[in-house]
């Protein structure tokens, strides 16, 4: 089973550090907008949360991702569940970086506005904290995963086909040239190549 950029889209709770970890709730501000409140401390505090963090630090609590993954693994009795996504190794790492770098909104395949704006009209996503999921059997970058499954050979084939037909290229030759360029984007360590690919294997 393959899940490409799925877990980061699943619903999550939001924890905010304000002298201790509190869950962020959303309330109607009374003027047609929504506001955040922090009414209660998290008790018990989830084990993934660091004991201390900078004031205002935020992290996602991703029970939805864990629930989906548990269900997927039950369905795949012999095979593997493969997840490709924005991810960080630990929840503590998310707490230590600006939260707007991991909590993002999208509308029409472009970045959206503030996460409390336009409910229902934009997607809210969060980097996946790997330590909140069951421990995977294999973790690779997307670049490593694609190289493991032969992308370098496909690129070499594309280069040869383009070189052979470059003088009078047809649609097939142009597709081979596109293969080379697409691979560069997929393997870019500063971009898509840095995606995390995690695998849970059932024998």
What is each PLM-predicted segment?
Residues 2-50, 96-107:
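A mobile, often basic/glycine-rich helix-loop segment
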Residues 45-203:
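Long, Lys/Arg- and hydrophobic-enriched amphipathic alpha-helices
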